[in-house]
From Swiss-Prot:
Chief localization: cytoplasm
Protein name stated in the entry: Ribosomal RNA large subunit methyltransferase G
Class of this enzyme: transferase
GO biological process, one term: rRNA base methylation
Known catalytic reactions: guanosine(1835) in 23S rRNA + S-adenosyl-L-methionine = N(2)-methylguanosine(1835) in 23S rRNA + S-adenosyl-L-homocysteine + H(+)
Keywords: Cytoplasm, Methyltransferase, rRNA processing, S-adenosyl-L-methionine, Transferase
Name of the gene encoding the protein in the UniProt record: rlmG
Length: 376
């Protein structure tokens, strides 16, 4: 796996986060290279303020921080950690780390944007750029050419202003725009709905998974979550909007609740949803990489709906890390509940970790399976 990016007679050593042995995926892509080469051709004055949005593992921040002031905005805790680690690895100056809920710096010289997967997140980002920037500030986005649709460009036109694209290079394309549309379109970051028959109301911020309705996996596990008067606490790992925590909290009013996700918007959404649905409870919502820093043998129950993407890449290492971390953090006799697509084979992974006799199927249907693993 390649860890050295050499471009324009410079070399950076870059790693994904968390750093893993036998890593097969590199920390940058051709889109990063295309942006770097294009911006270098602009010959920006030194100490220009470059605002970078969605710098997945800090490649752009590392490159431009040597000569410029850099602010990196991302909804991803892991992207923040990766950026800091790669800056240190390459002995580069620190950058300002912001979330995409923070105001866009209004003194930017140029904005570089890795297009997000979610259109709701993109619309939110574009609306905030329009609000913060003057019309002469270039906004340059990048993505794989096949992911830049006419509908994508229409969103730029609607929320920013006139928009053009580059030629494709290594299957990537640049998008050029500026904040000229007048008047600016107001965008509400929140989207809400109710879930029957559970008397649950949910509010989602723009980058939260399944942003405008309840996903089928969550709906299935809601039917089976347990009420247990002896349950002292539980962790919702990869909590998203916190819907599983809300339901478990309804069923177990005595339990302390901890929600963990790597998305800052997910954590903010979960915090609001728990407060709105459960009132004053012992609740902690934490942006984190899985269960990093959680003490061993400290939790009675963990519920987990693992993602199988990291940024744009399909991978199962996040689920594996979640399962390993859960085993470490669970008390003896503690339970891990997992919901997943049947074809992902989580039962095999859990049997490897917990022992085959300690893993059982709680429920399944044609698409999903709910598994329980008990720590012995």
């Amino acid at each position: 796996m390649k860890t050295e990016l050499t471009l324009l007679e410079q070399t950076l050593t870059l790693h994904r986060f968390p750093k893993r042995n036998n890593e097969t995926l590199q920390a940058w892509d051709a889109g990063d290279e295309y942006l770097i080469q294009h911006v270098e051709q602009l010959a920006l004055p030194e100490s220009s303020h470059i605002v970078i949005i969605n710098d997945h593992f800090g490649t752009l921040s590392c490159w431009f921080s040597q000569k410029h002031k850099v602010s990196m905005m991302s909804d991803s805790y892991i992207a923040h950690q990766a950026t800091q680690a790669n800056l240190q690895q390459n002995q580069r100056p620190p950058v300002q780390l912001l979330t995409t809920l923070d105001p866009v710096p209004n003194d930017a010289s140029v904005v570089l944007l890795q297009l997000p997967k979610s259109n709701r997140h993109l619309v939110w980002i574009l609306s905030q750029l329009r609000k913060a920037l003057s019309p002469n500030i270039p906004i340059i986005a990048v993505n794989k050419a096949k992911e830049i649709h006419t509908s994508t460009l229409n969103l730029f036109e609607k929320h920013l202003g006139p928009t053009t694209t580059s030629l494709a290079w290594k299957k990537h394309r640049l998008v050029f725009s500026s904040a000229t549309v007048n008047p600016a379109n107001e965008v509400n970051p929140e989207c809400g709905w109710s879930i029957e028959p559970y008397a649950i109301t949910l509010t989602n911020l723009p980058n939260v998974y399944s942003g405008e309705s309840l996903d089928l996996g969550s709906r299935f596990i809601l039917e089976h979550l347990p009420a247990d008067p002896t349950l002292e606490d539980f962790i919702d790992l990869g909590c998203g909007n916190g819907v599983l925590s809300v339901r478990l909290g309804q069923l177990n009013p005595q339990a302390k609740i901890t929600c963990v996700d790597e998305s800052f918007m997910a954590i903010a959404s979960a915090q609001k949803n728990l407060h709105d649905n459960l009132g004053k409870r012992d609740i902690h919502c934490i942006a984190n990489n899985c269960l990093d820093g959680f003490p061993a043998h400290s939790s009675s129950m963990i519920v987990c709906n693992p993602p199988f993407h990291q940024q744009q890449t399909i991978t199962d290492h996040i689920a594996w890390q979640m399962f390993c971390d859960s085993k470490h953090v669970l008390k003896k006799g503690g339970k891990l509940w997992v919901i997943g697509n049947r074809h992902l084979g989580y039962d095999v992974k859990l049997a490897r970790l917990f022992g085959k006799s300690h893993v059982r199927v709680i429920a399944n249907n044609s698409k999903f399976v709910i598994l329980q693993a008990i720590k012995s």
